[in-house]
C-alpha cells in the first residue's frame, strides 16, 4: 500500500470522524452581540406653532448613533423562528433642517430604545454552515431623556424650552445571515428597516416659568439599522 494511499485513507477517516457543524434546528436558542448602528432616513413636517400655524422652512433632521446591539432567535421549527432586537440606549441629536433652520445646528437630543420582534424564515437546510434569513414584525420605540439646547431657546426668544417625543409603534423588516464557525459559535450580519414616526412637542417658557408658546412637529425617522457581531447557539 503506497504512502500516498495511506495518507488519503487517514485523511478520509479523520474527516469522517470529525463532528459536522450542525446549524439550526427546532428548539435552538441563538444569542448575538455586536455593533449596531441606527441610521435614520428622517424627514419632518414644518414646525406648527399652536394657535398661529406652520412656520415655513422650519424642519428638523435626526443623526445616527452606534451602540451595543443584542439579538436573539428561538427556532420554532428547523426553518421558522421568532427573533428579537434590543440594544443599549441610542442617543440622537435633533438638528435644524429646511430653508429656515438648515444652518442652526443641534436643537435638541433624545435617547431611545427600539425593541423589535420579528418572525424569521431560514431557507437553508439545518446542516448548512451558512444560514441566511429574512424576517418581518413589529417595533416599539420608547423615547426618553429629551433635552433642548440653548440654540433652540435663543431661536424662539424664550427663557427656557423643553421637548417631548411620543413613543412609536410600527412595522419592521430584516435580512441577515449567520455563518457557523464551530458547532456553537458563528458570525452574523443583519440589516433592519423600521417604521418609526413620532410627534415632537416643544414648549417655550418665560423667566417666571410660565408656558408662553407650544409648537409641534411630525418626524418620520424610519431608520436603517446595521449590525455586525458574533453569535452563540445554545
Cite the ranges covered by each PLM segment.
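Short sequence motifs at beta-strands and strand-loop junctions characteristic
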Residues: 60-66, 109-114, 163-170, 218-222
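Predominantly the C-terminal beta-signal and adjacent terminal strand-loop region
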Residues: 91, 95, 182-234
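Cleavable N-terminal export/targeting peptides
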Residues: 1-27
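Outer-membrane beta-barrel translocator domains and adjoining extracellular loop/strand segments
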Residues: 43-51, 93-103, 144-157, 200-207
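Short glycine/proline- and aromatic-enriched beta-strand/turn motifs that initiate or cap beta-hairpins
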Residues: 22-69, 233
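Gram-negative (and chloroplast) outer-membrane scaffold detector with strong preference
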Residues: 28, 39, 71-150, 221-234
Amino acid at each position: 500500500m503506497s504512502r500516498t494511499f495511506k495518507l488519503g485513507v487517514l485523511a478520509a477517516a479523520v474527516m469522517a470522524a470529525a463532528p459536522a457543524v450542525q446549524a439550526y434546528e427546532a428548539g435552538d436558542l441563538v444569542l448575538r452581540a455586536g455593533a449596531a448602528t441606527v441610521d435614520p432616513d428622517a424627514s419632518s413636517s414644518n414646525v406648527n406653532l399652536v394657535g398661529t400655524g406652520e412656520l415655513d422652512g422650519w424642519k428638523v433632521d435626526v443623526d445616527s448613533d452606534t451602540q451595543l446591539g443584542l439579538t436573539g432567535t428561538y427556532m420554532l421549527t428547523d426553518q421558522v423562528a421568532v427573533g428579537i432586537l434590543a440594544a443599549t440606549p441610542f442617543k440622537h441629536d435633533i438638528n435644524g433642517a429646511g430653508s429656515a433652520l438648515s444652518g442652526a445646528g443641534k436643537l435638541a437630543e433624545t435617547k431611545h430604545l427600539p425593541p423589535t420582534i420579528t418572525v424569521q424564515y431560514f431557507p437553508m437546510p439545518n446542516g448548512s454552515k451558512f444560514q441566511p434569513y429574512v424576517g418581518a414584525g413589529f417595533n416599539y420605540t420608547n423615547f426618553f431623556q429629551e433635552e433642548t439646547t440653548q440654540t433652540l431657546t435663543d431661536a424662539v426668544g424664550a427663557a427656557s424650552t423643553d421637548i417631548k417625543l411620543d413613543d412609536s409603534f410600527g412595522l419592521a423588516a430584516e435580512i441577515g445571515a449567520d455563518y457557523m464557525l464551530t458547532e456553537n459559535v458563528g458570525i452574523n450580519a443583519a440589516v433592519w428597516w423600521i417604521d418609526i414616526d413620532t410627534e415632537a412637542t416643544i414648549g417655550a417658557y418665560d423667566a417666571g416659568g410660565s408656558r408662553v408658546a407650544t409648537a409641534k412637529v411630525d418626524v418620520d425617522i424610519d431608520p436603517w439599522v446595521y449590525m455586525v457581531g458574533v453569535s452563540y447557539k445554545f
